[in-house]
Structure formats: C-alpha cells, structure tokens
C-alpha cells in the first residue's frame, strides 16, 4: 500500500503529538489498557505479538512487565513515537519500526496476535487496515473509546482535537469486524477508572482537587458500574467508556 493512504496532515500531527510527551499521564492510561488486553485474552496464550500504532510504547512496557508474550514487536507512524519506544529498552521487544499506517511489513501469518489499542478511531481507511491486519495475524485485539453519544455531531471540534475521526459503539465495532471476516472470541466493556479521572482533572486540567470534585468522580464511577451490573449487557454497553474485543480471522469479506 502506498504512503498516500495516510494524509500528510495526520502524519505531521502525530509526529508533533509525541514530541509534546507526558510520560506519567500516558503510563497511567496504558496500565489500564494493558489490563484490559490481558483480561480479554486470558483464555489464550500468545508467543509472538505485534502492537500496531504503539504510540510511545507504554502498553508494551506493561505487557513486558507482566510476561504477556515472550516476543513483542511494535509499529508506529511517528518518528517521535518510535524514539520513545526505543528509549524504554523493553526486554522482550524484538523490533520497532516506523510504518505508513496501512502496510504491515511482515509476511502472512507472522504473528499470533496484533493489538490495536485506541488506534482505529484515528484511522482514515479503517477497513483497509483491518484487511491488512487479518493477513498478518491469527488473532486481533481491538480497544476503542465509546465516543458515540446522541448529539456527537455537535461536539466535532472536541473529538477532532483528539484525532478521533471515527465513532464506535460496541455494536458498531462488532458489525465492522464481523463484516470483515473476523469471529468474536471474547469482549468486555470498561469504565474510566477514578484514578485516571482524578489525574486528568487535577493534573492535566489543573482543577481544584476539592472534596466535592473527588466525591463526584468516585460517585459517577460507582453509579455507572452499578447500572451496568444490574441492567445487563445493554446497559453495560450504554454506560461504558471503552470496549475491548478479541477476534480471530474466519473468512474473507462477503457481500451479496
């Protein structure tokens, strides 16, 4: 696939993004994402794992610490991201490469699993990427934020500022991957943990860490957890902040 599939503006934005790096914040978020990966794939063992869109390598850092797989690899579209990954000196990381966003520089069935964590919402041509990932790995694990809400189109600037150009619900993501010939193996919904919310509010946004503000964060988390637990799968998906799904490749895309 040609480099032209990824817009020059998108490439430049991510180069700049990782240059303005906040390691403490990214490590905190990555710890919970890595926990989701481990939990959803707990019934499987993987020897050779590739993370596509590996960012600064924070997820791989935790997966290495937890002995998730003996051999890890990373692909990232930004030079600054690659530099951050290399600087972490992750023991089980066998290779780090910059790539064009769509072409995976490995032969067919090279990996037991590919991880795509909080990447798909940024991808301009999502189906092209999914087909390439299916070529290279037996399993694919995707995590996306559940950004879609009623009136999401009125908040375009908010989401575009984060680079989120695709909106997903658990249902819409399942439809996407199954229509591309993947089989759903395991999945889970998750909420933003209060630890992450507190850091974002009081460190990133520099809000006052008042008792009321802390209580509100904790109450919202517990209330959403309770509603999801009591209301079944539909309510769990309604209140979720993120969705993680493990897929295996099954067949090629079939239309008509």
Predicted ranges, named:
Residues 122:
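Di-metal (Zn2+ and/or Mg2+/Mn2+) metal-binding site signature of metallo-dependent hydrolases
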Residues 1-107, 113, 130, 163, ...:
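Conserved N-terminal segment of class I S-adenosyl-L-methionine
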Residues 165-181, 187:
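Short alpha-helix
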Residues 127-142:
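A short glycine-rich, Lys/Arg-flanked "PGG" loop and its adjoining helix->strand segment in the class I
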């Amino acid at each position: 696939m040609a480099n032209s599939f990824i817009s020059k503006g998108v490439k430049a934005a991510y180069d700049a993004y990782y240059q303005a790096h906040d390691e403490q914040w990214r490590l905190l978020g990555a710890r919970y994402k890595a926990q989701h990966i481990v939990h959803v794939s707990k019934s499987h063992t993987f020897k050779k794992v590739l993370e596509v869109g590996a960012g600064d390598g924070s997820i791989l850092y935790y997966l290495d610490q937890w002995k998730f797989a003996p051999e890890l690899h990373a692909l990232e579209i930004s030079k600054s991201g690659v530099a951050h990954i290399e600087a972490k000196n992750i023991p089980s990381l066998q290779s780090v490469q910059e790539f064009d966003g769509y072409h995976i520089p490995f032969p067919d069935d090279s990996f037991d699993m590919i991880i795509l964590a909080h990447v798909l919402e940024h991808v301009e041509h999502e189906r092209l990427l999914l087909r390439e990932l299916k070529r290279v790995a037996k399993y694919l694990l995707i995590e996306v934020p559940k950004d879609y809400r009623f009136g999401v189109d009125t908040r375009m600037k908010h989401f575009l500022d984060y680079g989120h150009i695709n909106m997903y619900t658990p249902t819409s993501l399942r439809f996407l991957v199954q229509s591309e010939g993947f089989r759903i193996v395991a999945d889970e919904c998750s909420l933003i943990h209060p630890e992450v919310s507190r850091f974002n509010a009081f460190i990133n946004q520099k809000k006052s860490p008042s008792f009321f503000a802390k209580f509100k964060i904790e109450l919202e988390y517990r209330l959403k957890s309770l509603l999801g637990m009591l209301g079944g799968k539909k309510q769990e998906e309604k209140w979720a902040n993120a969705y993680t799904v493990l897929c295996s490749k099954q067949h090629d895309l079939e239309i008509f």
